[in-house]
């Protein structure tokens, strides 16, 4: 039996236990509630609502867990972007944006997780997304730039946990267009001019 199968069985068992607990609570409390009057009835109702809320939250937790495991599996097996797009039913239609689909965030998670796994540079991400083939004034208008922005955001957060002399190796490098894009992203993330110069390289002209 595979790991995913065992996880689903355990999650289903937990869900059934929660339902059974809620049902048992109702059965035990009914006589006492009738004897104690309106005040007790309100207390019972509030407690039931808490139990029901916990039960209703469990399926979404299971769903989130399964999705995360699936993404991890895709990353480990190095599946193609086309495979993941197909699995997530993400289809680029004329006049629409993939970013409007809730599953686009899962695709971003797959891409960023893969880059982190291989310790990819931002330049590799930039080129992998095809941003190097576009005029600079068009880059920010496509869905792929949103994914690139997320990767820079993750690395910026990682930089906050490192010594300043390690920043350069994390975010430096790239064409003038990519460096300008990174500088603009880092600015929106609250990095000042000095910090951006340290991250990108002292020779880089960064926008104020």
Swiss-Prot record:
Q: Where can the motif RxLR-dEER be found?
A: 41-54
TM segment ranges? none
Q: Where does this protein have coiled-coil stretches?
A: none
One GO location term (cellular component): host cell peroxisome
Q: Please give the residue ranges the record annotates as the region Linker region ln1.
A: 93-110
Q: Quick one: where is this thing mainly located?
A: secreted
The organism sits in which domain of life?
Answer: Eukaryota
Region entry Linker region ln2: which residue ranges?
A: 158-170
Q: Name one GO biological process term.
A: symbiont-mediated perturbation of host vesicle-mediated transport
| Chain residue ranges for the region called W2-motif | 111-136
What residue range is the signal peptide? 1-22
Could you list this entry's UniProt keywords, alphabetically sorted: Host cytoplasm, Host nucleus, Repeat, Secreted, Signal, Virulence
Ranges where the record places region Y-motif? 137-157
Q: What is known of its domains?
A: The RxLR-dEER motif acts to carry the protein into the host cell cytoplasm through binding to cell surface phosphatidylinositol-3-phosphate. The C-terminal domain of Avr1 comprises three motifs (W1, W2, and Y), two linker regions (ln1 and ln2), and at the very end the T-region. The T-region of AVR1 is important but not sufficient to trigger R1-mediated HR and W1, W2 and Y are equally important for recognition by R1.
Subunit organization: Interacts with host exocyst component Sec5.
Q: Which family does it belong to?
A: Belongs to the RxLR effector family.
Q: What does this protein do?
A: Secreted effector that acts as an elicitor of hypersensitive response (HR) specifically on plants carrying defense protein R1, through its interaction with this protein. Also acts as a virulence factor that promotes colonization and suppresses cell death induced by CRN2 as well as callose deposition, a hallmark of basal defense. Interacts with host exocyst component Sec5 and thereby disturbs vesicle trafficking, a cellular process that is important for basal defense.
Entry protein name: RxLR effector protein Avr1
This chain is encoded by the gene named: Avr1
């Amino acid at each position: 039996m595979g790991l995913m199968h065992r996880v689903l069985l355990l999650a289903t068992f937990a869900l059934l236990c929660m339902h059974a607990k809620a049902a048992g609570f109702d059965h035990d409390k009914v006589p006492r509630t009738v004897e104690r009057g309106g005040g007790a009835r309100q207390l019972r109702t509030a407690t039931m609502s808490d139990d029901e809320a916990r039960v209703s939250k469990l399926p979404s937790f299971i769903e989130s867990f399964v999705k995360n495991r699936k993404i991890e599996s895709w990353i480990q097996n190095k599946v193609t972007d086309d495979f993941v797009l197909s699995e997530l039913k993400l289809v680029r239609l004329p006049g629409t944006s993939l970013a409007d689909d809730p599953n686009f965030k899962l695709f971003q998670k797959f891409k960023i997780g893969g880059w982190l796994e291989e310790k990819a540079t931002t330049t590799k991400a930039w080129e992998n997304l095809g941003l190097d083939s576009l005029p600079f004034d068009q880059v920010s208008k496509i869905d792929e730039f949103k994914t690139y922005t997320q990767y820079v955001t993750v690395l910026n957060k990682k930089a906050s946990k490192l010594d300043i002399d390690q920043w350069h190796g994390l975010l430096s490098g790239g064409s003038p267009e990519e460096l300008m894009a990174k500088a603009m992203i880092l600015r929106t993330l609250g990095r000042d001019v000095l910090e951006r110069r340290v991250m990108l390289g002292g020779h880089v002209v960064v926008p104020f």
